[in-house]
Swiss-Prot record:
Function recorded in the entry: DNA-dependent RNA polymerase catalyzes the transcription of DNA into RNA using the four ribonucleoside triphosphates as substrates.
Pfam families: RNA_pol_Rpb2_1, RNA_pol_Rpb2_2, RNA_pol_Rpb2_3, RNA_pol_Rpb2_45, RNA_pol_Rpb2_6, RNA_pol_Rpb2_7
Organism annotation: Sorangium cellulosum (strain So ce56)
HAMAP family listed in its UniProt record: RNApol_bact_RpoB
Gene: rpoB
Subunit structure: The RNAP catalytic core consists of 2 alpha, 1 beta, 1 beta' and 1 omega subunit. When a sigma factor is associated with the core the holoenzyme is formed, which can initiate transcription.
Similarity comment text for this entry: Belongs to the RNA polymerase beta chain family.
Protein name (database record): DNA-directed RNA polymerase subunit beta
Length: 1378
């Protein structure tokens, strides 16, 4: 029976109090789902949605020629299987991509006399459209052999935005409001107020014009516009020549009355007072309909329409004209009984649009369209037809203007929220409508009138994510549009369109070129950070505000970078780079996902009538507005009701204290607001934000170590991250482990399709992008039962399927001889000796033999002027052997390059004369190990151009690879056969033979009626099993047919692989042969290496002390690391102290359990102790009761390093938990102990904080940084040595160093620094010659940089000449002048 205690699963005590409601969504889903949606690879062509590639093809096709006689129509596309698999692409430096084939129809039309078109001919053909990179299982792309990630972009969402200039434009500080309609692609439309309150419009940020020009161009008259933007009041002429106006109750609030308003004798509103709500209510009750007016009240009002004399038909007052006393007199004379005026009171309603109409000189629709044309195409003589076309194309043509669904959604949200659903514009309407433009102006005027508020562009409802799929879609569209132009020209130019096929018209080069360029060099397509699994996952979850169409570092202000209230649960407030990109590059939060519109959503639990339900809904930042949201850590009772009478809740970004009934939603988890990297930091809630940021970022730089150990104090997120990162091997189906070795695991599957076993090949010592070592090792044993999703093998930096970036080490916080000054770290020699922090790094070196002008370079062992000692590790082909230990300067690949005839020096001539013509025409250009690198050669690969003969080494490598592939093939087929025959055996056993079975030689193997049992079946050769006559013979036959089919496809697959091996490689032009050599470098921990904890506590190793000199505990155990206690208070990362206490307790509890096993205590006693340790963790209740004695021992063995704790972020262990763990382990609850000095044996004065801390070794290794220059390159202009290790540069002597030399009065040393050691070219040569002669005097000349300065001055037209005179002559000349 299989054990309850799994070898591939770690039990972690959960110290959190909040129950898990939903699982964290797949961490790299943002990449995978986006690209899947783009390709729709698994969807049949006729069922594809109009998104991604399908949408691009649909939007560009059909392509019509200029005459309308033919068109090219898109039918469907399909992606073929990729030529090389992922591993082959990595090794060969290829792109992992699939050929895309598009089915097109070329339709040719005939035009009849009446203008009617009829189809004359349709030609359909599948056309090759280039290659499209595919995404790997882990969400990356392989481009030219390297893994790259396309980072998602966070950009401003299309839609309409309202803003003001914050009073900066005008000196008075007046707020000038503006509106901007941003489409996904197309022209931008801006409306803005000027300081005189006139509304202007700009199209594509050109010169501004009156907004009414655009509105008139839409076909609206002055009257239409006034009636749209203003309410009207009707004025009546009453008997006696008095005026009255109709009461519009909606407009009364806030107005003043000019006379007492009475109902009967009661005065409701006194003269010169405002209408109150109560007064309006009384007026409504009394059903007052008119208010009498004084004539002077009408003076200055504006007519809402042309007021016409009914008798003469003459217009007395034009629309938008002010009423004057004279006009009123004329109206009275003409006896016009009623007319409408605009309601403009200057308080609630301003006269902005009316004023704009007055100042606008353009009055008709046609003139307006021509005016717009003139502004956009200055210099072009406009005709009405071209102007109309241009205007229509600007905003109303779907080919030129696209709001996208998101833009339409945002417009509907802004303008039509109160309109019934069926009356709103549909999401498929992605062009502007005249109504949208009117609404934009109306909203702008409302803002100016003091109603509503401007938009916050940093609100996540106004920013959206463009993931890989969408970015690729845009690139593909650019390529297709380029191709479309060429196709149109070809279709129109070609006379024989009848004889052409679609492939004659289509040249897909521009499309593939765009795609290739995007993946190779776009700002968002990045070289994957592959230091460890966490850095990979974080890179894929990154959101960047930079990139094409985004912000730039220099222009981005503080607001864009800042944390916004809507980031909660969507974007991590902690994880962002330090430096110029701070805030511009962010990370998705743990539970966040991106919806179909590109807005980031976060999950919430629904709360109904003060009771929290299990329903989870995902909301975007816009949908969350106006909701009261409780925290995940609020106390609930059994029924899900709030225990407290008042609850803290978020409301529109503010925290409020509300009653439980008001709460509508609740967070799903405490770690909902932080990203994955921040969620891995235990006790994050006790760390200062700046240090938490460093802690989250530095985990990404941790190097995978030779021995991985998961943290004793984790957060429970480790297992999820390791699983989703793709570095572990995960079981695809349930089954039983059949065989395990270091390179592959075979699982006999159960359930559907169980005949085919699952074979998992493990990755072995692969070089990552950052030269760290990626390797996998099995964690399951033969015979073990595995479930779907179980971990079968650990990858780099994982331990039992959990992320393990560092090591648990015993740390003491105390000063030690000044060796922990400025965050330095004192380390015990045991750490170096036991390889605790040892890592393996794999460097790749490349040697290329080219065809040069002087002849071909050759890779060979025969190198001129090199002794046999230097060639001892090279084989006959001149390539280093695998397993050789190499040091700096050793030859890895011998190569000779032909050189031109050069003038020989006398020495060379002499040597030639003595030794004859020894390799005079070639020089040694071998690949040597660079300085600072040394290790063991673990692999060498030879790539030869197709058609060239391979050398011995290449043939050896090919033979080995072929043998490996054949071995794998044979093993796979054997496993397949065994599995199928096992199935047949199960079918046959116990059955009765219905006939006799005879072999080829006539021997009877089975008699009729015999019962088939195990021994008799074992004696029959397998090839006869299918012929055994039984009732189920047909099923057996079917199984055998399936087996043969499977075997055939597998053999074909491997045959293809072998064929590709022998073909030769595709190399860049001019390259004959390329050799790659891989060297594994073992890096032990040493002085100068950088280490860090998870709380931003970083430091450099200052000294490695012998174990016996380290401070030790009372039981004699020396500590591993000594850290500076002064690094904690000022940095406020107290989380590390809590971690160290809990870690110590966890470690000692593990030791206690081991001692109990050693003392052979009863398993019941051990179980009780385990229950006490895991008390409070609901998941572990009842687990220990089911364990037998063997299981107990096995379980205790899994905690030999300590009891693993999980302290989730923001829901972590409390002080009582930590004290409880220390107490249970028999340790002082203060977390401090007496330490003894290892050198003297004396106790230190005070108790010291000691415990287990999880420390990481970071990628900043001293071996990669240490560097010394001997003879190196000089800068071309200044003639000074270059800087930096990569350039083999020198150490810069800056002005501060010069001051120091001056302060010491070391004049000659300083002169030497500034001249011969730097850029005095002549002086350098003289110095060399002098030293050779044994003369050690310094003769400095003129530094080259002085000449540069003179040249710069001359470039400024200042002539500077150096005049050489002797000092004496100069002095006397000066005296004479005096």
């Amino acid at each position: 029976m299989p054990s309850v205690v799994q070898s591939n699963f770690r039990v972690r005590k959960n110290l959190g109090r909040v129950r898990r409601i939903i699982d964290v969504p797949n961490l790299i889903d943002i990449q995978k789902s986006s690209y899947d949606k783009f390709l729709q690879m698994s969807v049949p062509p006729n069922e594809r949605e109009e998104v991604g590639l399908q949408a691009v093809f649909r939007s560009v096709f059909p392509i019509k020629d200029f005459n309308g006689t033919s068109e090219l129509v898109f039918v469907s596309y399909n992606l073929e299987p990729p030529k090389y698999d992922v591993d082959e692409c990595r090794q060969r430096g290829m792109t992992y991509s699939a050929p895309i084939k598009v089915t097109n129809q070329l339709m040719i039309y005939d035009t009849r006399d009446g203008g009617e078109r009829i189809v004359r001919d349709i030609k359909e053909q599948e056309v090759y459209f280039g290659e499209l990179p595919l995404m790997t299982e882990t969400g990356t792309f392989i481009i030219n052999g390297t893994e790259r990630v396309v980072v998602s972009q966070l950009h401003r969402s299309p839609g309409v935005f309202f803003d003001h200039d914050k009073g900066k434009t005008h000196s008075s500080g007046k707020l000038l409001y503006s509106a901007r309609v941003i489409p996904y692609r197309g022209s931008w439309l801006d409306f803005e107020f000027d300081p005189k309150d006139i509304i202007y419009v700009r199209i594509d940020r050109r010169r501004k014009m009156h907004a009414t020009v655009l509105l008139r161009a839409l076909g609206y008259s002055t009257q239409d516009l006034l009636n749209y933007f203003y309410s009207t009041e009707t004025v009546y002429l009453e008997k006696g020549g008095k005026y009255a106006k109709s009461i519009e109750y909606d407009l009364l609030a806030g107005q003043r009355t000019t006379r007492d308003i009475k109902i009967g004798n009661d005065v409701i509103v006194k003269k010169n007072t405002k209408f109150t709500r109560a007064a309006i209510r009384k007026m409504k009750e009394a059903k007052l309909e008119r208010l009498s007016l004084e004539p002077e009240e009408l003076v200055g009002k504006v007519a809402a329409h042309d007021i016409v004399d009914p008798e003469t038909g003459e217009v007395v007052v034009e629309v938008n004209e002010e009423l004057t006393e004279a006009k009123l007199e004329r109206l009275r004379d003409a006896n016009i009984e009623q007319f409408r005026i605009l309601f403009i009171d200057g308080l609630n309603v301003g006269s902005y649009l009316r004023d704009t109409l007055l100042t606008d000189k353009v009055k008709t629709m046609e003139d307006s369209i021509l005016e717009i044309y003139r502004r956009l195409r200055p210099g072009d003589p406009p005709t009405l037809e071209t102007a109309k076309t241009l205007f229509h194309n600007l905003f109303f043509n779907a080919e030129r203007y696209d709001l996208s669904k998101v833009g339409r959604l945002k417009l509907n949200y802004k303008f039509y929220r109160d309109v019934p659903e069926d009356e709103r514009p549909g999401l498929d309407l992605t062009v502007l409508t005249p109504q949208d433009i009117l609404e934009t102006v109306r909203h702008l005027i409302e803002l100016k009138n003091g109603r509503g508020s401007v938009d916050d562009i940093d609100h996540l409802g106004n920013r959206r994510v463009r993931a890989v799929g969408e970015l690729m879609e845009n690139q593909y569209r650019i390529g297709l549009v380029r191709m479309e132009r060429a196709i149109k020209e070809r279709m129109s130019m070609s006379q024989e369109i009848d004889t052409l096929m679609p492939h004659d018209l289509i040249n897909a080069k521009p499309v593939s070129a765009v795609v290739k360029e995007y993946f190779g060099s776009s700002q968002l397509s990045q070289f994957m950070d592959q230091t460890n699994p966490l850095s990979e996952v974080t890179h894929k979850r990154r959101l960047s505000a930079l990139g094409p169409g985004g912000l730039t570092r220099e222009r981005a202000g503080f607001e864009v970078r800042d944390v916004h209230a809507t980031h909660y649960g969507r974007i991590c407030p902690i994880e962002t780079p330090e430096g110029p990109n701070i805030g511009l590059i962010a990370s998705l939060s743990t539970f966040a996902r991106v919806n179909e519109f590109g807005f980031v959503e976060t999950p919430y639990r629904k709360v109904e009538n003060g009771r929290v339900t299990e329903d989870v809904i995902w909301l975007s930042a816009l949908e969350e507005e106006g909701k009261y949201i409780a925290q995940a850590t609020v106390n609930l009772d059994e029924g899900g009701r709030f225990k407290e009478s008042l609850v803290s809740a978020r409301y529109n970004g503010e925290f409020k204290i509300v009653t439980p009934e008001m709460v509508e939603l609740m967070d799903v988890a405490p770690n909902q607001m932080v990203s994955v990297a921040a969620a891995l930091v235990p006790f994050l809630e006790h760390d200062d934000a700046n240090r938490a940021l460093m802690g989250a970022n530095m985990q990404r730089q941790a190097v995978p170590l030779v021995q991985s150990h998961a943290p004793l104090v984790g957060t429970g997120m480790e297992e999820r991250l390791a699983r989703d990162s793709g570095v572990c091997v995960i079981a695809r189906r349930p089954g039983v482990v059949e065989s395990v070795d270091a390179t592959r695991i075979v699982v006999r599957a159960e359930g559907e399709g169980a005949e085919v076993p699952d074979i998992y090949h493990l990755m072995k010592f692969q070089r990552s992008n950052q030269s760290t070592c990626y390797t996998q090792k099995p964690v399951v044993r033969t015979g073990e039962v595995v479930k779907k999703g179980d971990v079968l093998a650990d990858g780099p930096s994982t331990d039992m399927g959990e992320l393990a970036l560092g090591q648990n080490v015993l740390v003491a916080f105390m000063p030690w001889q000044g060796y922990n000054f400025e965050d330095s770290i004192l380390v015990s020699e045991r750490i170096a000796k036991d390889d605790v922090f040892t890592s393996i790094h794999i460097e790749e070196f490349e040697c290329v033999a080219r065809d040069t002008k002087l002849g071909k370079e050759e890779i060979t062992r025969d190198i001129p002027n090199v002794g046999e000692e230097a060639l001892k590790d090279l084989d006959d082909s001149g390539i280093v052997r695998i397993g050789a230990e190499v040091r700096p300067g050793d030859i890895l690949v011998g190569k000779i390059t032909p050189k031109g005839e050069t003038q020989l020096s006398p020495e060379e001539k002499l040597l030639r004369a003595i030794f004859g013509e020894k390799a005079g025409d070639v020089r040694d250009s071998s690949l040597k190990v660079p300085p600072g690198v040394g290790g063991i050669v673990i692999n060498a690969r030879v790539f030869s151009r197709k058609g060239t003969e391979k050398d011995d080494r290449a043939r050896d490598i090919e033979d080995q690879e072929r043998a490996r592939i054949e071995r794998t093939r044979d093993e796979e087929i054997k496993i397949l056969r065994d599995s199928f025959f096992r199935r047949i055996r199960e079918l046959l056993l116990g059955k009765e033979a219905t006939g006799k079975l005879v072999d080829d030689k006539g021997k009877v193997l089975f008699q009729k009626g015999a019962i088939i049992d195990e021994p008799s079946l074992a004696e029959i050769p397998r090839k006869y099993w299918g012929e055994i006559p039984v009732d189920d013979a047909e099923r057996v036959q079917q199984i055998l047919r399936d087996l043969e089919e499977l075997v055939r496809t597998r053999e074909e697959h491997f045959r293809d692989k072998i064929d590709r091996l022998s073909k030769g490689d595709e190399l860049p032009p001019g390259v004959i042969k390329m050799v790659k050599v891989y060297i594994a470098i073992k890096r032990k921990l040493q002085v100068g290496d950088k280490m860090a904890g998870r709380h931003g506590n970083k430091g450099v190793i200052s000294r490695i002390l012998p174990e016996e000199d380290m401070p030790y505990l009372q039981d004699g155990r020396p500590v591993d690391l000594v850290l500076n206690p002064l690094g904690v208070p000022s940095r406020m990362n107290v989380g590390q102290i809590l971690e160290i206490h809990l870690g110590w307790g966890a470690f000692e509890l593990g030791n206690q359990l081991q001692r109990m096993i050693e003392q052979q205590r009863a398993s019941a006693e051990i179980k009780e102790h385990l229950k006490a340790i895991y008390a409070g963790d609901e998941t572990m209740n009842g687990f220990f009761d089911n364990l037998d004695d063997g299981d107990v021992k096995r379980f205790v063995k899994t905690v030999d390093e300590g009891v693993f704790m999980g302290s989730p972020v923001f829901d972590g262990a409390h002080e009582s938990d930590i004290k409880g763990a220390l107490d249970l382990a028999g340790l002082p609850t203060s977390g401090q102990a007496i330490l003894f000095d290892g050198r003297t044996g004396d106790a230190f004065d005070q108790n010291v904080t000691v415990g287990i801390m999880y420390m990481l070794k970071l990628h900043h290794l001293v071996d990669d940084k240490i560097h010394a220059r001997s003879i190196g390159p000089y800068s071309l202009v200044t003639q000074q040595p270059l800087g930096g290790k990569a350039q083999f540069g020198g150490q810069r002597l800056g002005e501060m160093e010069v001051w120091a030399m001056e302060a010491y009065g070391a004049a000659y040393a300083l002169q030497e620094f500034l001249t011969v050691k730097s850029d005095d070219v002549m002086g350098r040569t003289r110095m060399y010659e002098a030293i050779v002669k044994g003369d050690y005097t310094l003769e400095a000349g003129l530094p080259e940089s002085f000449n540069v300065l003179i040249k710069e001055l001359q470039s400024l037209c200042l002539n500077v000449e150096l005049v050489e005179t002797s000092a004496g002559v100069e002095a006397s000349a000066a005296e004479e002048e005096e």
